[in-house]
């Protein structure tokens, strides 16, 4: 048998076709193409959003910001800043876009502060819809927001009115993951109490947050347990730090206090590792929910509005045609009346001449 023939012999048992290798083909294609993911972070200044994002992806994506003073907050407006970075790990490329919202919740009057954020989300849907409807659909860049980390202050007793308004305004457009920031300012008991309070208020106000899918029945027990723990950890209480400090003879990222060290990646100290695990293991699901639920809802609404406007235009056109015909009929009637009047005058003048 030649080498060429040997390459096409069936290495498996008789009756094996080879469909089982399809997932490997999809995996290889996906790895070559790379992955795209857009994460939005929303919350008041001073909650450590930039630090947490840098800690999550081990990159200096965002510089540390100066927290604005009281005078600066009076007329503070919300800005939208999108930063993209290419991350490669073991041959797998991730095009990560992080959308930051500096100024959110900082002004004295925060009534409309989330409207620029909603406009940004809708604009990304609109852009994707436009590209998807175009001729060149092979190289569409997906800038839709796949996930939103919403940062909740640890210094309150639950959700603020602004938190409720924002999440209710956005929960049908984006996968919202609530995050309680600066967990190192709370005791373990205070964390659990605040978590329960936030979850109760989320349910009370009918806010839809991202629901982690249940593990399949054929998944191994470790994955099922991991899924159970991740679900039980929502909202995640996290600590972020980019500083390496020495603890128990090893270098760790954390925060040093007079009473000890808070380690960022220690699950006994905070939920940082759980949050990162959730994001990495459910990145595909977050994208699918964005595509199948949020984007489809947006697309359906746009199509309905398009059809409604066309029907309205048709009705307007019919009314215009009818009005034009009525006007033309009136003009003809007036013209006939004038002609009859002229004929009558001519007839009367002719009779007078005969007399």
From Swiss-Prot:
Gene3D superfamilies: P-loop containing nucleotide triphosphate hydrolases. PROSITE patterns: G_SEPTIN. Residues 259-269 are annotated as: Important for dimerization. Residues 43-50 are annotated as: G1 motif. GO terms for molecular function: GTP binding. Residues 181-184 are annotated as: G4 motif. The keyword Aminoacyl-tRNA synthetase does not apply. Residues 33-305 form the Septin-type G domain. It is found in: Cytoplasm; Cytoplasm, Cytoskeleton; Cytoplasm, Cytoskeleton, Spindle; Cleavage furrow. The record marks 155 as: Important for dimerization. Keywords: Cell cycle, Cell division, Cell membrane, Cell projection, Cytoplasm, Cytoskeleton, GTP-binding, Membrane, Mitosis, Nucleotide-binding. Residues 100-103 are annotated as: G3 motif. GO terms for cellular component: cell cortex; ciliary membrane; cleavage furrow; cytoplasm; midbody; spindle. Filament-forming cytoskeletal GTPase. Required for normal organization of the actin cytoskeleton. Plays a role in the biogenesis of polarized columnar-shaped epithelium. Required for the progression through mitosis through regulation of chromosome congression. During anaphase, may be required for chromosome segregation and spindle elongation. Plays a role in ciliogenesis and collective cell movements including convergent extension during gastrulation. Septins polymerize into heterooligomeric protein complexes that form filaments, and associate with cellular membranes, actin filaments and microtubules. GTPase activity is required for filament formation. Can form heterooligomers with other family members and form filaments. Interacts with wdpcp. Belongs to the TRAFAC class TrmE-Era-EngA-EngB-Septin-like GTPase superfamily. Septin GTPase family. This is Septin-2B. The lineage of its organism: Eukaryota, Metazoa, Chordata, Craniata, Vertebrata.
């Amino acid at each position: 048998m030649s080498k060429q023939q040997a390459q096409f012999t069936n290495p498996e048992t008789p009756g094996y076709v080879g469909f089982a290798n399809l997932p490997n083909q999809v995996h290889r294609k996906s790895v070559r193409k790379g992955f795209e993911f857009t994460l939005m972070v929303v919350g008041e200044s001073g909650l450590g959003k930039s630090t947490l994002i840098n800690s999550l992806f081990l990159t200096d994506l965002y510089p540390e910001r100066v927290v604005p003073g009281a005078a600066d907050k009076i007329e503070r407006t919300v800005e939208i800043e999108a930063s993209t970075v290419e991350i490669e790990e073991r041959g797998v490329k991730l095009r990560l876009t992080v959308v930051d919202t500096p100024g959110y919740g900082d002004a004295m009057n925060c009534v409309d502060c989330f409207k620029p954020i909603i406009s940004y989300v809708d604009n990304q849907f609109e852009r994707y819809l436009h590209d998807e409807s175009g001729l060149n659909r092979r190289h569409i860049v997906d800038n839709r927001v796949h996930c939103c980390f919403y940062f909740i202050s640890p210094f309150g007793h639950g959700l603020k009115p602004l938190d409720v308004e924002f999440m209710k305004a956005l929960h049908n457009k984006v996968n919202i993951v609530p995050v309680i920031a600066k967990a190192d300012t709370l005791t373990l008991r205070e964390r659990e109490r605040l978590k329960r309070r936030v979850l109760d208020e989320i349910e009370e106000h009918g806010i839809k947050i991202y629901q982690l899918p249940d593990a399949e029945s054929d998944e191994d027990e470790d994955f099922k347990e991991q899924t159970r723990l991740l679900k039980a950890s929502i909202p995640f209480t996290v600590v972020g730090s980019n500083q390496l400090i020495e603890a128990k003879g090893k270098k760790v990222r954390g925060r040093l206090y007079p009473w000890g060290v808070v380690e960022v990646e220690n699950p006994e100290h905070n939920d940082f590792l759980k949050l990162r695990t959730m994001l990495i293991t459910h990145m595909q699901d977050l994208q699918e929910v964005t595509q199948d639920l949020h984007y489809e809802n947006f697309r359906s609404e746009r199509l309905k509005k398009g059809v409604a406007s066309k029907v309205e235009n048709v009705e307007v056109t019919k009314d215009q045609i009818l009005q034009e015909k009525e006007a033309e009929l009136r003009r003809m009637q007036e013209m006939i009346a004038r002609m009859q009047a002229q004929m009558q005058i001519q007839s009367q003048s002719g009779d007078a001449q005969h007399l």
